Amino acid sequence: MDVLYSLSKTLKDARDKIVEGTLYSNVSDLIQQFNQMIITMNGNEFQTGGIGNLPIRNWNFDFGLLGTTLLNLDANYVETARNTIDYFVDFVDNVCMDEMVRESQRNGIAPQSDSLRKLSGIKFKRINFDNSSEYIENWNLQNRRQRTGFTFHKPNIFPYSASFTLNRSQPAHDNLMGTMWLNAGSEIQVAGFDYSCAINAPANIQQFEHIVQLRRVLTTATITLLPDAERFSFPRVINSADGATTWYFNPVILRPNNVEVEFLLNGQIINTYQARFGTIIARNFDTIRLSFQLMRPPNMTPAVAALFPNAQPFEHHATVGLTLRIESAVCESVLADASKTMLANVTSVRQEYAIPVGPVFPPGMNWTDLITNYSPSREDNLQRVFTVASIRSMLVK
């Protein structure tokens, strides 16, 4: 894997810097590295593809070295280099695709394609000169079963979940109280509602709670907490739990009271915030507990009092909500996130070449399914294919 990364890094630098008019002295070190790559690869044969509709391709390496010059690189020099670069880039691209479409239930962190296994041989280590990639660093750590750490921006840690619970209901669905939520990606939105605006609740206060368990532990997380849930701020028709009917939700938004968010690890509270909004942090956690209250306004203007009558019918439904968004965090496991295209890269290649469903990944690389059942086997395979996708993205956008 590290050899594949170094190949890609060398080719990217060569493609960017070996251009007509450049002083040879400015790229002499790169050309020496480029020539070392050619020397190491010459005389070797590889085969890629042969799974799904990914075609079988044979690769043979027999290229001349780039020479030295005292002056600028001319058009002939650059054209010779380009022909070599293009072949090598095509080879790396196909090795990456061949690796990204394969999976294994055992030792899925190790190379799975014949071509990448061959590149792992000792003689190709002479190519290796750069392991600065976060993915390569973590792949080497995971391969040795040592602790890894990925930094993510808006990590997709929450499987998609959208539902509701009713703490008070009737067959007519005309005086409901409960919570509804939408968890997806890096965001939780939860709303508590009471059609009667807590008129019969103790002290005219309704208490709500929402608990979310993560599939992986996050550390050093930067989080945004807002006293609102905008996705639940407009009227909607909702299917009943048994699917037998529908009920109408017409929210009027109030500010939540006594808001508390707790971050827990193995059942122990690590961080707690009370009535604090905006940016907060959490050291390490695998569970988030949100609690908040809906308080009936003690003083209301006639217009507000008309929204919340003392008896039915309740045409407007008092609602309070919270939004929690994980902006960035560190995780030992690889995840999809907002700043990287690894999941899309892997999924698109598997779709384009009609790769059959294997023993590890769900059909279509469904992320909700994958993260909901994030087994060690899936973790190993996902880290490997994401590492390869990061290498491919250096050369192929």
UniProtKB/Swiss-Prot annotation:
Binding-site list for Ca(2+): 266, 286
Gene3D superfamilies in UniProt: 2.60.120.170, Viral capsid alpha domain
Coiled coil: none
One matching Pfam family: Rota_Capsid_VP6
InterPro entries named among the record's database cross-references: Capsid_hemagglutn, Rotavirus_A/C_VP6, Virus_capsid_a-hlx_vir
UniProt region (Interaction with the inner capsid protein VP2), positions on chain: 62-73
Compartment list: Virion
GO cellular component terms attached to this protein's record: T=13 icosahedral viral capsid; viral envelope; viral intermediate capsid
SUPFAM superfamilies named in the record: A virus capsid protein alpha-helical domain (SSF48345), Viral protein domain (SSF49818)
Major localization class: virion
Miscellaneous comment as given in the Swiss-Prot or TrEMBL entry: The VP6 trimer contains a zinc ion located at the center of the molecule. The zinc ion is not essential for either trimerization or transcription activity of the DLP. Zinc-depleted VP6 has an increased sensitivity to proteases.
Family: Belongs to the rotavirus VP6 family.
Quaternary structure annotation from Swiss-Prot or TrEMBL: Homotrimer. Interacts with the inner capsid protein VP2. Interacts with the outer capsid glycoprotein VP7. Interacts with the outer capsid protein VP5*.
Record function comment: Intermediate capsid protein that self assembles to form an icosahedral capsid with a T=13 symmetry, which consists of 230 trimers of VP6, with channels at each of its five-fold vertices. This capsid constitutes the middle concentric layer of the viral mature particle. The innermost VP2 capsid and the intermediate VP6 capsid remain intact following cell entry to protect the dsRNA from degradation and to prevent unfavorable antiviral responses in the host cell during all the replication cycle of the virus.
Protein name: Intermediate capsid protein VP6
Organism listed in the record: Rotavirus A (strain RVA/Monkey/United States/RRV/1975/G3P5B[3]) (RV-A)
